[in-house]
Curated annotation (Swiss-Prot):
It holds the Pfam family HTH_CodY. One of its GO terms (cellular component) is cytoplasm. The keyword Transcription regulation applies. Gene3D superfamilies: 3.30.450.40, Winged helix-like DNA-binding domain superfamily/Winged helix DNA-binding domain. This is Global transcriptional regulator CodY. HAMAP family: HTH_type_CodY (MF_00621). DNA-binding global transcriptional regulator which is involved in the adaptive response to starvation and acts by directly or indirectly controlling the expression of numerous genes in response to nutrient availability. During rapid exponential growth, CodY is highly active and represses genes whose products allow adaptation to nutrient depletion.
Amino acid sequence: MTLLEKTRKLNRILQKTGIQPVDFMEMASILKEVIEANVYILSRKGKVLGYSALKDYGDEIFAKDKAIPEEYNDRLLRVTETLANDKGKLFKEEKALADLIVTVVPINGGGDRLGTLLLIRSTKEFTDDDLIIAEYGATVVGLEILRAKNEEIEEEARKRAVVQMALATLSYSELQAIKNIFEELKGKEGLLVASKIADKVGITRSVIVNALRKFESAGIIESRSLGMKGTHIRVLNEKLLEELEKMKRD
């Protein structure tokens, strides 16, 4: 397979980005095929995002428990540019790895270290063509990690905005009711006895019901009546608890 053909294989994954999330296991599998090595895609914290083994070289330590040992990950993070064809130096304590050829490619994006691409072979050293493909693959992985992070940030902002808008619709009495309800629950779900809250705050049960309805219609909570026992409440948007805690501090 020529360098161009190998690059085109990776391009097919890149073309999916934005339409559907990149499958890191698929990415590792394609890199394994084009580079002919065991491939591990690691997050910054050492979590195994994807891996694919060409042969059993005794390097299962990198797939075990879906994360590599912290000490090893720290060593990988200290590699700031491609380290090619390491032989028994990086992981010298591991006898199984002593005779293997290891290449480490940092995954960077947005000025940050996002993870590590690890390539392992038993004999033949990695060529310049292999390293070009590996670094290109690391770039594709970095772009996908950044995209996922941006989506997560956007989703967090959306959830917070929904909570803030819902809180803004509450009357003073309803806000006091909500504050007391979640102080009473002490967590993301629990049983609410409306009459108990009403007596404590000095409001009517209808105020509590209205406040809960507003939050339920906003998709922030769900509630289920248990008759005489009370109402079971579960928080669907965890930003609610954060905003209430912030109000308490302010």
